[in-house]
Amino acid sequence: MMSFTDHQYGKQAWEDVWAKKNGDDTYEWGPDPLLTPLGMKQAQHVHDTWTSFLQMPTYLHPPLPELVCSSPLRRSLSTLCISWQGILPHGTKVHIREHLREVMGKNTCDQRVTRTDLERHMQLRPFRIAIHGE
């Protein structure tokens, strides 16, 4: 979303004005914006690539992750879910770690929702979450 808004408003206007707001008349980018349609498409590409790998003979495909971690931002969790749903076993634990966030800044897009909202966001997903470092 930030590259889109940088392009739409210009970097200086983004930093001076728009980054402090939750959105405009068209888009919401804070706090903790959802994954954009482009992000969903990219995550689906990751999923499809892994699915292709796993259809190869076992000795050719890479091993599945043994530890799954994510930042606490909803867009990160959505990327993880789209990428790995149906590949990792149902109920796989996702370790949510605060320090995995790309930025802990003052811009609204860098702020995250509450633990309750994160749990609600993940409620219908096939993964269990374990939140660390709050």
Can you annotate each of these PLM segments?
Residues M1-T92, I96, G105, T116-L124:
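Active-site-proximal alpha-helix that buttresses catalytic centers in soluble enzyme cores
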Residues R97-E102, H132-E134:
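Short linear capping/connector segments at secondary-structure termini
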Residues R101-Q111:
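Short alpha-helix plus adjacent loop in nuclease-associated cores
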Residues Q111-E134:
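Acidic, glycine-rich loop-and-strand cores that form catalytic or ligand-binding grooves
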